[in-house]
């Protein structure tokens, strides 16, 4: 699994994401990137081969991950402000207890958010209706800091 990040550099998140994905695909396979297709629920994928990917972008950066199995990535800038009322909508009861005990509620909610988004991207199901059904931990090792972003990467086992 390989994760890479780059500044948007005046490009849209979509443009920068496709550029980074194309570069990473070329470096991994030595071949031009095949067409990107989209599943029914919106998950992009390559129609051929065994390379899986996920892309996310923030205001300043785009991040991409390549893997041999389905994968999802999400990122938020460390300084991003977030409406704390979102906690009521996305956190399970156990997560809510962790959130309430956290010294920095904004950062705790961002940690849960990026992890839930990465899980949703990996599964291809999106966040439609189930974010509170998943019980996660604030200390989940899949959450990292990369280039000033809080990043979560989830891959199928």
Give residue ranges: language-model regions:
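Core catalytic alpha/beta fold that binds nucleotide/phospho-ligands
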Residues: 1-157
């Amino acid at each position: 699994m390989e994760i890479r990040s780059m500044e948007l550099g005046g490009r849209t998140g979509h443009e920068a994401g496709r550029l980074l994905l194309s570069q990473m695909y070329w470096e991994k396979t030595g071949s031009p990137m095949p067409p990107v297709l989209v599943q029914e629920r919106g998950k992009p994928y390559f129609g051929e081969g065994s390379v899986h990917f996920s892309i996310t972008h923030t205001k300043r950066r785009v991040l991409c991950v390549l893997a041999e199995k389905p994968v999802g990535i999400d990122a938020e800038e460390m300084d991003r402000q977030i409406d704390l009322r979102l906690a009521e909508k996305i956190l399970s009861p156990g997560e809510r207890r962790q959130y309430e005990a956290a010294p920095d509620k904004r950062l705790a909610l961002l940690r849960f958010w990026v992890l839930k988004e990465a899980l949703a991207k990996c599964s291809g199901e999106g966040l439609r209706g189930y974010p509170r059904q998943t019980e996660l931990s604030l200390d989940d090792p899949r959450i990292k800091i990369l280039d000033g972003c809080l990043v979560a990467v989830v891959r199928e086992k």
